[in-house]
UniProtKB/Swiss-Prot annotation:
InterPro entries: Aa-tRNA-synt_II, aa-tRNA-synth_II, aa-tRNA-synth_II/BPL/LPL, Lys-tRNA-ligase_II, Lys-tRNA-ligase_II_bac/euk, Lys-tRNA-ligase_II_N, Lys-tRNA-synth_II_C, NA-bd_OB-fold. This is Lysine--tRNA ligase. Homodimer. GO terms for biological process: lysyl-tRNA aminoacylation. Keywords: Aminoacyl-tRNA synthetase, ATP-binding, Cytoplasm, Ligase, Magnesium, Metal-binding, Nucleotide-binding, Protein biosynthesis. Belongs to the class-II aminoacyl-tRNA synthetase family. The gene is lysS. It is found in: Cytoplasm. It is an enzyme of class 6 (ligase). Binds 3 Mg(2+) ions per subunit. Its cofactor is Mg(2+). Mg(2+) 1 binds at residues 408, 415.
Length: 499
């Protein structure tokens, strides 16, 4: 469609509307009724692809298929077309003497993009292409707009995202990506259900934006006359359920963060969060690597995948590396010995690590990791032992309380999961929230708000608990070799189209 000028496009629109008018004049419904299919295109290939031309002629197999006309050729009393459904394409052969004058005229005047139903016999052409010889041809939906150029598809990447329906029509690869996405989520559910987890649903609108460090979307409830926040995480409601005795829970759902758009970020995205009573972050590490490997095996048939230039091995057990050791390995800076914030700032200056004046030692450690280590983590790696300053909901490590029992999973230099042994001490939790409030006062609008109701829930007693969050969109990117998050979201966030 990029190659057409407006005049050509308008001509095509007019011609198709004239055809629509003619169909109605003839008493033919251009937007037809239910059509019963016996087979999808991939069924035909798997069931009959191995038969010879002669065997198919002898068997006289009758089928009924439906789909969109993608190619069409032929003149006179016979013609060929390719019909596309969700699973692929199959060729049809339409002869005037086989379908009759009226139906052949329908075929002759059909346009690329029209949706049709075909009844006929399976056969092979002289060059061996499995096809359907039509005995009936039904117009199901008249297409009033021409499809993008079949040889070039949608060249404009932005148009692919804005008009995803055209992308799905013209790109088999795109269709396969979204079918795979559905399978990934299905296998994730199956794995957790089979391991005794209970799927639950919790509110998407919260009185307090909690469970993550992020800027929320704010909305207003008219009847209650109160501000609400679209959830930035699922966490705190699920942990209330752990308090209530639901010992293994998970939720797959949308999360909203009022932040930038990039190849890795969309303002609304899909997460899974899960929590298990009487477990810790080490148990959750095992669960994570086993679940991701299971999904890869079931959906892709392998745990060795290609992402960009990298071959990634998802077979457990994955590398486990303390954040401080990772920093020492990749930069030489050693944070194991306790130090003052002035010493940490001097170290940052020495290693050209950019920091803000308000940062404490833990924040500086995290900046070292993000600037010196993160882009080196290609194979699956659990980075654990995050500083307490950046982990307000994680339990302190017993041996070194400067750090927490928390991990993040990195693959191809991207964070794919975040998990901890959950903080279940209500007094410590309140102190952490208060420290976060001070950060908000200093200008960090992503710092956690105080949540007194959650503190009260913890005061009733939450068992030792391991929790996990995985960004499903990024996992789908990894398993489908997609370079951008927009390639795995059916309708990604876009700016208003400029006229």
């Amino acid at each position: 469609m990029d190659n057409m000028n407006h005049e050509e496009l308008n001509d095509q629109l007019l011609v198709r509307r004239e055809k629509l008018h003619n169909l109605r004049e003839q008493g033919i419904d251009p937007f037809g009724k239910r059509f019963e299919r016996t087979n999808a295109t991939n069924d035909l290939l798997s069931l009959y692809g191995e038969f010879s031309k002669e065997e198919l002629e002898e068997k006289e197999i009758s089928v009924s298929i439906a789909g969109r006309i993608m190619t069409k050729r032929g003149k006179g009393k016979a013609g060929f077309a390719h019909i596309q459904d969700l699973h692929g394409q199959v060729q049809i052969y339409v002869r005037k003497d086989a379908v009759g004058d009226e139906e052949y005229e329908l075929f002759k005047t059909a346009d690329l993009g029209d949706l049709v139903g075909i009844e006929g016999k399976v056969f092979k052409t002289n060059v061996g292409e499995l096809s359907v010889k039509a005995t009936g041809f039904t117009l199901l939906t008249k297409s009033l707009r021409p499809l993008p150029d079949k040889y070039h598809g949608l060249k404009d990447v932005e148009q692919r995202y804005r008009q995803r329906y055209l992308d799905l029509i013209t790109s088999m690869e795109s269709r396969e990506t979204f079918v795979t996405r559905s399978k990934i989520i299905r296998e994730m559910r199956r794995y957790l259900d089979d391991n005794g987890y209970l799927e639950v649903e919790t509110p998407m609108m919260h009185a307090i934006a909690g469970g993550a460090s992020a800027r929320p979307f704010i909305t207003h409830h008219n009847a209650l006359d109160m501000e609400l926040y679209m959830r930035i995480a699922i966490e705190l409601h699920l942990k209330r359920l752990i308090v209530g005795g639901l010992e293994k829970v998970y939720e797959i759902g949308r999360v909203f963060r009022n932040e930038g758009v990039s190849t890795r970020h969309n303002p609304e995205f899909t997460m899974i969060e899960l929590y298990e009573a009487y477990a810790d972050y080490k148990d959750i590490m095992k669960l994570t690597e086993n679940m991701v490997a299971h999904i890869a095996k079931q959906v892709l048939g392998t745990t060795t995948i290609q992402y960009g230039d990298y071959e990634i091995n998802l077979e457990p057990e994955w590398t486990r590396l303390h954040m401080v050791d990772a920093i020492k390995e990749h930069s030489g800076a050693d944070f194991w010995n306790p130090m003052s914030v002035e010493e940490a700032r001097e170290l940052a200056k020495e290693h050209n690590v950019e920091i803000k004046d308000t940062m404490e030692v833990g924040h500086i450690i995290n900046e070292f990791f993000e600037q010196k280590v993160e882009d080196k983590l290609i194979q699956p790696t659990f980075i654990y032992g995050h500083p307490v300053e950046i982990s307000p909901l994680a339990k302190k490590n017993d041996e070194d309380p400067r750090f927490t029992d928390r991990f993040e999973l990195f693959i191809v230099a991207r964070e794919h999961a975040n998990a901890f042994t959950e903080l279940n001490d209500p007094i410590d939790q309140k102190e952490r929230f208060e420290a976060q409030l001070k950060e908000r006062e200093q200008g960090n609008d992503e710092a956690h708000m105080m949540d007194d109701d959650y503190i009260e829930a913890l005061e009733y007693g939450m068992p030792p608990t391991g929790g996990l969050g995985i960004g499903i969109d990024r996992l789908v990117m990894l398993l489908t070799n997609a370079p951008s998050i927009r390639d795995v979201l059916l309708f990604p966030a876009m700016r208003h189209k400029q006229d």
